Amino acid sequence: MVDQLRERTTMADPLRERTELLLADYLGYCAREPGTPEPAPSTPEAAVLRSAAARLRQIHRSFFSAYLGYPGNRFELVALMADSVLSDSPGPTWGRVVTLVTFAGTLLERGPLVTARWKKWGFQPRLKEQEGDVARDCQRLVALLSSRLMGQHRAWLQAQGGWDGFCHFFRTPFPLAFWRKQLVQAFLSCLLTTAFIYLWTRLL
């Protein structure tokens, strides 16, 4: 998927192209088959994102692991999460962006087909997922997240220095407490959103 994006690069919108490439790199990395060698990051920001996402998942291991094998509609869940996490006051932050992309990547990982948690909530087990289904969802999530970041949040992204600013932010040697606070605040927003989504789906 990353190679396909590189092939159609036109330089008409460098920021959008970097955004799509970054998302394709991380989500494709998450969606690969178990046992597949880990591909090298395609860009400097891809390496930074993988590192930041790994730290976030380590801090909140139980939350993210619960979404492995999510049997519902990945696209709809991430769309709801994006609307809440990016638009909720005070708006986007780098921590929120990392949290959202990490969440999307977790949904694409090849975990158990359906965990006990999802069975308890009324989801039915599904048959073994086809490779094409994961690839399709990966492409749809790249398009969705790119659209969100390059739409109403483009001005914010540019004001932060784009993806160069992203790399600078996470490579700056802030105290660990400051760095962790950024991710914890974004995570709490994500957690509240998932609680709302659960209640919403149960009432439908």
UniProtKB/Swiss-Prot annotation:
The entry's keywords: Apoptosis, Cytoplasm, Cytoskeleton, Endoplasmic reticulum, Isopeptide bond, Membrane, Mitochondrion, Nucleus, Transmembrane, Transmembrane helix, Ubl conjugation
GO CC term, one of those recorded: membrane
Gene Ontology MF terms in the entry: calcium ion binding; caspase binding; channel activity
Positions in coiled-coil regions: none
Role this protein plays: Promotes cell survival by suppressing apoptosis induced by BAX but not BAK. Increases binding of AHCYL1/IRBIT to ITPR1. Reduces ITPR1-mediated calcium release from the endoplasmic reticulum cooperatively with AHCYL1/IRBIT under normal cellular conditions. Under apoptotic stress conditions, dissociates from ITPR1 and is displaced from mitochondria-associated endoplasmic reticulum membranes, leading to increased Ca(2+) transfer to mitochondria which promotes apoptosis.
InterPro entries: Bcl-2-like_sf, Bcl-2_BH1-3, Bcl-2_fam, Bcl2-like, Bcl2_BH1_motif_CS, Bcl2_BH2_motif_CS
Gene that this polypeptide is encoded by: BCL2L10
Broad class of where this protein is predominantly found: mitochondrion
Name of the featured protein: Bcl-2-like protein 10
Entry annotated with the keyword Transmembrane: yes
Organism: Homo sapiens
Cofactor: Ca(2+)
Processing and modification events after translation: Monoubiquitinated by UBQLN1; results in stabilization of BCL2L10 protein abundance and in relocalization from mitochondria to cytoplasm.
Motif window: BH1: 86-105
Domain of life: Eukaryota
Residues joined by cross-link Glycyl lysine isopeptide (Lys-Gly) (interchain with G-Cter in ubiquitin): K119, K120, K128
Localization (cell): Mitochondrion; Nucleus membrane; Endoplasmic reticulum; Cytoplasm, Cytoskeleton, Spindle
Subunit and interaction comment: Interacts with BAX. Interacts with BCL2 and BCL2L1/BCLX. Interacts with APAF1. Interacts with ITPR1, ITPR2 and ITPR3; the interaction with ITPR1 is increased in the presence of AHCLY1. Interacts with AHCYL1. Interacts with HIP1R (via ENTH and I/LWEQ domains). Interacts with CASP9. Interacts with BCL2L11/BIM. Interacts with BIK. Interacts with UBQLN4. Interacts with NME2/NM23-H2. Interacts with PMAIP1/NOXA. Interacts with TPX2. Interacts with UBQLN1; in the cytoplasm. Interacts (via BH1 domain) with BECN1.
Parts of the chain that traverse the membrane: 183-200
